[in-house]
Each structure stands twice: as structure tokens, then as C-alpha cells.
Amino acid sequence: MQQVSKVKTSPTGPEFSQLIQGYWRLAAWEMSPQERLTFLKQHVELGITTVDNAAIYGNSEVLFGEALKLDPTMRDHIEIISKFGINGIATSETEKRVSHYDSSQSLILSSTENSLKRLGVEQLDCLLVHRPDFLMEVDQIAEAFTKLQNSGKVKHFGVSNFSTSQFELLQSGLGQPLVTNQIEINPINFDVLEDGTSDQLQRLKTRPMAWSCLAGGDLFTAETEQAIRLRATLTELASELGATSINQVAFAWILKHPSNPLPIIGSGNIQRVTDTVGALSLQMNTEQWYRIWTASKDHGVA
């Protein structure tokens, strides 16, 4: 089995594993703390040392922290990413509000402190703005980032789901370079490959992180014409490439893009995670990549 290597996210950024383990659905995996720790050790053994979490992911940070507490030495072998900025609807009947974004300095500082406490760690390797806030004040974010970095609570900063203009706006006011933009990339939805987002990151030599690489499972189960076409093409290519699954082919398609994405694996099944690592060994050529593009679009290139 190929070992997942580490790569720099950007010229001044951290080294993360080429595949990232996502913990969004950790609660749904229904694992005991020991089972969570075992899973963590298993994917670290594969070389997947970078883990993705967020303040809004239910109690996933707490559950991850419980596992880490069983073997605190594992902290030295992983890189932890978390996110801030999405406030859910209040549970109190007397406090009526809508889910909203918040990138104020006070929210950033308190959210990060709470993430650190839930995870049971003293420092995040990377903190991301989860979604662009329409009321974003760059100076507020810059001050918060500086405080968090100077206090040793966060090493690096990035964004998630930012457009090119939003990325440039935030970067213009920061004292440190953004090290990534976590964006949706999959064979069903790859708008970021066409709207300038990936072009910007290539120019900056900054790797995107790719979320929803399997389109939330739609590649396997959706009955839309697009999904049916894609499954047929992915199955055909799996045979040509010697892949063990269409899962591998989908990840190989993402990995081939010259922006050099770092795909996030969403499964808590170590067999599925191990299978995904095999995508790194597939040698997909240009024509094969465009066959997936064509199956998604339902037309060829002009």
C-alpha cells in the first residue's frame, strides 16, 4: 500500500498530508472513544496525518478530543484544522434568531478558545474562516488572527468557500498569507475549476482543500441523468486504470488537477479510507480526465 506523503500547502504554509481525514460526521459513526482512537491511529499509519474539523460540526470536536485524551502522544503525529464563523439557530425558545455568519473579532477569539477546549489541545495547526461573511470586516479578522498567532494558539490561517474577490479582500488586510481555500470539488460539481477560484490558487501556488469529493454520496446513489452517466464512465475507467472502485477514480480525477488539491475523506470506515489511498497510484491521462468532464457536462469540449 502506498504511503500518503506530506506536501506544503503554500510557499509559506504548513506541511499537510496529501489526503486529509474529515471528521464532520464523527458522531454518526457511533464509535466508542477507544474505537475513535484506533481509527485515528489507523489512518495516521497510512500517512493521513491531517484532520479536518469545525466548531459547527455538532459535537465532533468533543468526540475527537475524548479519543485524543486516551493517548495524548498522538497530538505530536497529527495536524489539526478547525473552522469558525457559522452560528446555528439558538436552542433557547426565548432567543429567536436565524443561522448566520459572524466573523467579528470577539467571535473568532471565543470560537477558537472553545474549539481548543473541546479538542483538548493547546494549538491548532490551521484555522479557517468557514464561509464568507457578508458583514466581514477585514481589520477585525486581521486583529484576531494576529492575537491568536502571537499567543501560540494558531499556527496558520486559511479560508473555506471563498470566491476570488473575497479571498483577495481578506488577504489585503492580513499580516500573514492565507495558506488554503477549502472548496467543493467533485465530478458532479466543479464550478471552482471554471470560475477562477482554482486559477487564483494556482497563481499563488496555494493548494486548495477539496470537500465533498464524492458529492455527498450522489456519485453512488443519485438517479439523475448526470449521476448515471458519471457512474458508467467511472466504472469504465476503473477497469482501464486497474482501480478497485469508482471511489478511487473520483479521487484520482480531483488529484490530477494542476491546482494540486488536498482531498478530504469523509468516511469513518478504515477500509474505505485505505481504498481511497489507492487513488494516489492511479495514472489517469488527459483524455480519461476529460471523459469524466464530458460525462458530467453531457457534451464535449467546444
State what each model feature region is:
Residues 1-79, 301:
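N-terminal binding-site loop/beta-alpha segment at the start of enzyme catalytic domains
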Residues 10-15, 45, 67-79, 116-120, ...:
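Acidic (Asp/Glu)-rich catalytic clusters
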Residues 11-27, 81-99, 123, 128:
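N-terminal small/glycine-rich loop or linker at the start of catalytic domains
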Residues 132-302:
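Beta/alpha (TIM)-barrel catalytic core signal, keyed to glycine-rich beta->alpha loops juxtaposed to Asp/Glu
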Residues 30-43, 101-119, 140, 165-168, ...:
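Short, acidic/polar
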Residues 116-135:
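Active-site groove signature of glycoside hydrolases
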Residues 22, 54, 127-130, 160, ...:
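Conserved residues at the C-terminal ends of beta-strands
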Residues 18, 75-78, 82, 122-126, ...:
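Short acidic capping loops at alpha-helix termini that bridge into adjacent secondary structure
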